Amino acid sequence: TGVDSSRGMLDIFDRKIMEHTLKNVKTLHLDVEAGAALPGPYHLVVSSMTLHHIRDTAVLFHHFHEALLPSGLVCIADLDSENGLFHSDPTGTFHNGFDRAEFQRVLENAGFSHVTASTAAEIIKPVDRLGDHRFTVFLITGRKDVSK
């Protein structure tokens, strides 16, 4: 299930589902920030390059934890802290990346264990008149304990 509060993003995802003839993937328009609960239960929650567009990530991580089955995994890829250059138009961007150590603590506070972080990728992109700039993307994973 692909969940987003943006109908436009879900339309793009729906097109990709059709292009690849995926039969076991669906989309769901849901605004978790407005208090809507994720359906679930899920074995895995994945977020890729979206959390810097979420105001309160701590609340979202609690939603992720609640939606997971015991032993379920959360995998999050997003920007490391940066100086605001990644988005040329910052509309809808609430974080200029994240400090990994702080992000790990927020996941642990939401109830996740075995939280680890690593560098997943580097993005080189042109930044206005500054030329190419390097941005790193982290991957943080955590597990919902069996007892929870």
PLM regions and their residue ranges:
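Glycine-rich phosphate-binding loop signature in dinucleotide/nucleotide-binding domains
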Residues: A37-G40
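Short catalytic micro-motifs in class I SAM-dependent methyltransferases
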Residues: M49-T50
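C-terminal lobe and adjacent flexible extensions of AdoMet/dcAdoMet transferase-like proteins
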Residues: I140-K148
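A short glycine-rich, Lys/Arg-flanked "PGG" loop and its adjoining helix->strand segment in the class I
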Residues: A58-L73
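Class I SAM-dependent methyltransferase SAM/SAH-binding core
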Residues: T1-G35
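A conserved beta-strand element that flanks and buttresses the S-adenosyl-L-methionine
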Residues: V46
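C-terminal alpha-helical "lid/dimerization" subdomain adjacent to the S-adenosyl-L-methionine
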Residues: V3, C75-T136, T141
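Conserved acidic residues
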Residues: H43
